[in-house]
Design a protein with these regions (language model features):
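Sec-dependent N-terminal signal peptides
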Residues: 1-6
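Aromatic- and charge-enriched surface segment that lines or borders ligand/interaction sites
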Residues: 75-126
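Bacterial signal peptide processing site
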Residues: 16-18
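N-terminal lobe/hinge region of extracytoplasmic solute-binding protein
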Residues: 31-81, 206
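Short, well-ordered beta-strand elements
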Residues: 24-34, 85-89, 112-115, 161-162, ...
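Short, solvent-exposed loop/turn elements at domain surfaces
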Residues: 22, 36-43, 68-70, 96-97, ...
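Gly/Pro-rich hinge or "lid" segments in bacterial periplasmic/extracellular proteins
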Residues: 148-149, 158-159, 164-234
Length: 234
């Protein structure tokens, strides 16, 4: 078993202990069983990776302590009367940051389109969750169509992303919390190439969540730091 240390942070789920120092900084620790072998939240189905990236990557929605869906990257959303079209309005104060906490770019609707295309092209472990849900995605994954613009995800503008489904799914919003539908910045993705999310290098991904990953020491510790510029840092 290995431990996780979270520095200067708010509460983390499944924490087993906490402490404070003279500066008022808080440290939370919990036990995890397996080291992650990569940070690719878009493609891996491994819990070891998700346990790390769920603290540093935000999707459109998240669950509150009661299991209700609340805003995350999306500040508002709506569904068409026929239940086939879901439209999400992104908050304009959400940003991407490097592992050093430097602002990289705004989080935009195109990031969600880029994320799903990447997941489909890389045959993500999580595709089964959405492949038959999103219009045209199954055909794209199978190679029956090659133009991703025919898939039912669109960036209507910088802050509006829309999904078109094959049939109504009352549980669709739950899927927006999954890694396969998470965003990624296209410029950063292209700059990294095959090194994107490779291994456990914190600098191999960008961060739009409440914490920044600082280090992973195999069979020893994972260290996070509170993102001081996170839109909901307080």
């Amino acid at each position: 078993l290995a431990g996780v240390t979270l520095l200067a942070a708010a509460t983390l789920a499944a924490c087993s202990g906490s402490s404070s120092n003279a500066k008022g900084e808080k440290t939370f620790s919990y036990i995890y069983e397996t080291d992650p072998d990569n940070l690719n939240y878009l493609t891996t189905g491994k819990a070891a990776t998700a346990n790390i990236t769920s603290n540093v990557i935000d999707g459109l929605l998240e669950n509150d302590r009661y299991g209700n869906f609340v805003s995350s990257m999306a500040e508002d959303w709506s569904v068409s009367k026929d239940g086939l079209t879901y439209t999400y309005t992104l908050r304009k104060d959400a940003k991407w940051y490097t592992s050093e906490g430097e602002e990289y770019a705004e989080v935009k609707a195109q990031d969600f389109v880029t994320g799903l295309k990447y997941a489909a092209d890389k045959k993500s472990d999580g595709l089964y969750l959405v492949q038959e849900s999103i219009k045209g995605l199954d055909a794209y994954v199978k190679g029956e169509i090659t133009d991703f613009s025919q898939v039912g995800i669109k960036a209507l503008d910088d802050y509006t992303v829309q999904y078109t489904l094959n049939k109504p799914e009352s549980f669709w919003n739950s899927k927006t919390t999954m890694g396969v539908l998470a965003p990624v910045n296209e410029e950063f993705l292209n700059s990294k190439g095959d090194d994107f999310a490779k291994g456990t290098d914190p600098s191999s991904i960008l961060y739009n969540g409440p914490f920044l990953l600082k280090s992973i020491v195999a069979k020893s510790s994972v260290e996070f730091e509170k993102n001081p510029n996170y839109w909901d840092k307080d």
